[in-house]
């Protein structure tokens, strides 16, 4: 279902002209190329900056003029037992198209200018009813296939496979199993998004909400063929736990970093669970790692946040509410900071958002916190990346699960996800001051990261669909 607002039509012709020009330019080249203003991967690249420096159209001064360009909602369920068209994965924007998977198991290519469906493919859904999400959570990456020079969409699907799809029509180039063959597909779930770097693809697997636990792992594939190259297990054979439901980061030297989940049941040993692990990019052998100290552990205190590379550091927030900044070389703690409260039954995924890194500051979304004596259910703050010192902090009425995002115009978008009756929204914030510039009422939960691309803002609401905004 698609809605294009009348107010958008005067602007629409200009956007179509830009995208058409890009398409003609791409056609004249031997291979298409992702533009600097695109958002072609989860957290906008292997370093996970969540920052689009080249996209500058939306600024603090133009935010009041932001209007809805179009709104789209996926196809309803048509099969027995199929979940509805909720959106838990984030949009990927490349080459004039938006790619997104729905909870129904359908994966879509939409026209960036109008929201019209250009192609779709069904890739399955989980039969187990243990989580709200049973279809897509994994966010796609669009990258040039080294074997043919063509843009290709890589995505982890609900059926347990990593897919390579042609960006033109979503036809399949190859697929490779991520789940361990000795386990049924329904025991595993691909929360992780694929990270493409240096001719390889990295993706992790985890359980379906710990029911039951699975043996966590990270797998490396050849980008051109889908052949499995290496597999890192977080716990030894015979143990279950350490699921990787975050997405791997890659630094400028090619080293891979993975944050891991739940401690194995029935043992006091942690192995590589509840840790941030540095891995060899070719063999996935662990080179160094940080494990959350016993004094900071609690029941469900795993890492849901993906690691982010910033300067000489790598860091991620744990569900204990603490962000750990680690020296990349030694994986020792450079600094740590309590960002929000621990996870609870009512708010089970605290501090699961990755921060923004714009080259000078970190912007970290938190959960229940107190600012100047006032209690807030959520927050976002700007930090000095060298020390963790707070530069500004802004309270939000609800908690944050999806990572915040920022463009080169100095605007941050952060959505809230809360089970209370308090309305959720996407908040647009001035990156310089922390002032809330505008509240985009979404009418429901925002689990996915909003993204800035090609002068637009794309917000995916769990039950209300995908909305494109433009000034």
Labelled PLM ranges:
Residues 2-13:
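Bacterial N-terminal signal peptides that target proteins for export
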